[in-house]
């Protein structure tokens, strides 16, 4: 009798554990909650406000997910870990100001581009840095795994500067202010946010940068059904003006 009861209890525990696991790792078509990976150091796209992660990308993700029949849970991690987390199914999608470069497209799929920005050289106002030529012999910071890191490597041989990487944009800004970096390459809309709270910083847009080099898109696993669903929702938001309203809200302060 005791043996029978023990077997019954063991069976119940096994069933319960299996049920819990499947509720978190079910197929994309069967679950209603999606985990969004992001690097919450990229204001106004994604950043921490108290205990919450907010920003343009976060609000966009929630709006798109709602149209597609899902809810979004946001998970913060270093930018260079995002694609690995997506491929290993730790997250279901990535919104983090990520550019769909050819190298990234080999690993994951992307939505249509939802925002295009420019690269900016950020430095102290008293640095004497006013153009790319002024970077000769300087140390320029870039975010690890970012499109700005690629841009830095592309420009450094021509303009004679060296690059160093950091995990977070806030780290780059701190290194400039501490004189460990002479400058950094940061997306313009993000840099503008730092200028507002750091009046000792300045910046200029890198000239002749191709627009598609700085376009942002949503990353999904290869052959994910979510890609088409989110593209459809994104097209709807573009057509009805919702996307433009979000851009004005987060980038210009317009309601």
From Swiss-Prot:
InterPro entries: Iontro_rcpt_C, SBP_3_CS, Solute-binding_3/MltF_N. One of its GO terms (molecular function) is amino acid binding. The keyword Lipoprotein applies. Residues 1-19 form the signal peptide. It comes from the Bacteria. Gene3D superfamilies: Periplasmic binding protein-like II. It is a lipid-anchor. Coiled coil: none annotated. A lipid is attached at residue 20 (S-diacylglycerol cysteine). GO terms for biological process: amino acid transport. A lipid is attached at residue 20 (N-palmitoyl cysteine). Keywords: Amino-acid transport, Cell membrane, Lipoprotein, Membrane, Palmitate, Signal, Transport. Disruption phenotype: Cells show impaired growth on arginine as the nitrogen source. It is found in: Cell membrane. Part of a binding-protein-dependent transport system for arginine. This is Arginine-binding extracellular protein ArtP. The gene is artP.
């Amino acid at each position: 009798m005791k043996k029978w009861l023990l077997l019954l209890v063991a069976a119940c525990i096994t069933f319960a554990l299996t049920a819990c696991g499947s509720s978190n790792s079910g197929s994309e078509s069967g679950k209603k909650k999606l985990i969004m990976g992001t690097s919450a150091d990229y204001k106004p796209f994604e950043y921490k406000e108290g205990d919450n992660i907010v920003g343009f990308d976060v609000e966009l993700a929630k709006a798109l997910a709602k149209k597609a029949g899902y809810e979004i849970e946001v998970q913060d991690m270093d930018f260079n870990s995002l694609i690995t987390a997506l491929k290993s199914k730790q997250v279901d999608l990535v919104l983090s100001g990520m550019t769909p470069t050819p190298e990234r497209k080999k690993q994951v799929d992307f939505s249509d581009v939802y925002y295009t920005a420019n690269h900016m050289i950020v430095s102290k106002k008293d640095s004497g840095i006013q153009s790319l030529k002024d970077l000769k012999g300087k140390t320029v910071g870039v975010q690890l795994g970012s499109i700005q890191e690629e841009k830095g490597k592309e420009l450094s041989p021509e303009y004679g500067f060296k690059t160093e990487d950091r995990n977070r944009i806030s780290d780059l800004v701190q290194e400039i202010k501490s004189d460990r970096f002479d400058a950094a390459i940061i997306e313009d809309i993000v840099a503008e946010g730092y200028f507002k709270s750091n009046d000792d910083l300045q910046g200029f847009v890198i000239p002749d940068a191709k627009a598609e080099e700085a376009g942002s898109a949503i990353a999904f696993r290869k052959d994910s059904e979510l890609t088409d669903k989110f593209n459809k929702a994104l097209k709807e938001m573009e057509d009805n003006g919702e996307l433009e309203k979000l851009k004005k809200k987060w980038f210009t302060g317009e309601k």
